């Protein structure tokens, strides 16, 4: 759903284990090709706070920094069929430049961090833009069927998209 490390840190392992193909919004590509942007959070935090000793310890744990290249990308929208499932992807910038939401089948809507029930959408990180979220993304999301089942990147699953949008703030 977007390029932040808490959403992509298992991507390489999943691709290798499942021969999985990836699809993401164009703006993720530059970010995910830079190893400084894909460092596991624990490694980054300890490296800064504890220096070389922490980096050596974490290397022994085999925590890896990987870069990623997509199999497919899209700019604004994408529509494709995967077996019997129809998938639609929508660029939803605001939380990050590369944020995207995905409608899978007739009912499922994966929002990543574009909608996080009970929390304000974080737009203060690099690439975030509260104005774009409020002026472009939220109005677009309100055009989608409100009865879609919402699966956010964090928090409670199972509410409807309409319920998630009624609570959205930034």
Whereabouts are the PLM-identified features?
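Metallo-beta-lactamase
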Residues: 79, 86-170
């Amino acid at each position: 759903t977007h390029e932040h490390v808490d959403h992509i840190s298992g991507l390489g392992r999943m691709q290798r284990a499942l021969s999985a193909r990836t699809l993401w919004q164009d703006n993720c590509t530059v970010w995910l090709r830079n190893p400084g942007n894909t460092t596991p959070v624990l490694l980054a935090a300890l490296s800064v706070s504890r220096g070389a000793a922490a980096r050596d310890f974490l290397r022994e744990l085999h925590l890896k920094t990987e870069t990623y290249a997509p199999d497919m990308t899209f700019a604004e929208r994408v529509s494709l069929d995967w077996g019997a499932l129809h998938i639609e992807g929508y660029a939803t910038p605001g939380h990050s430049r590369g944020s995207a939401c995905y409608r899978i089948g007739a009912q499922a809507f994966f929002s990543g961090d574009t909608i996080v029930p009970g929390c304000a959408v974080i737009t203060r990180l690099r690439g975030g833009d509260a104005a774009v979220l409020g002026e472009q993304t939220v109005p677009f999301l309100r055009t989608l069927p409100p009865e879609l089942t919402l699966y956010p990147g964090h928090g409670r699953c199972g509410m409807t998209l309409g319920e998630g949008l009624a609570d959205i703030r930034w």
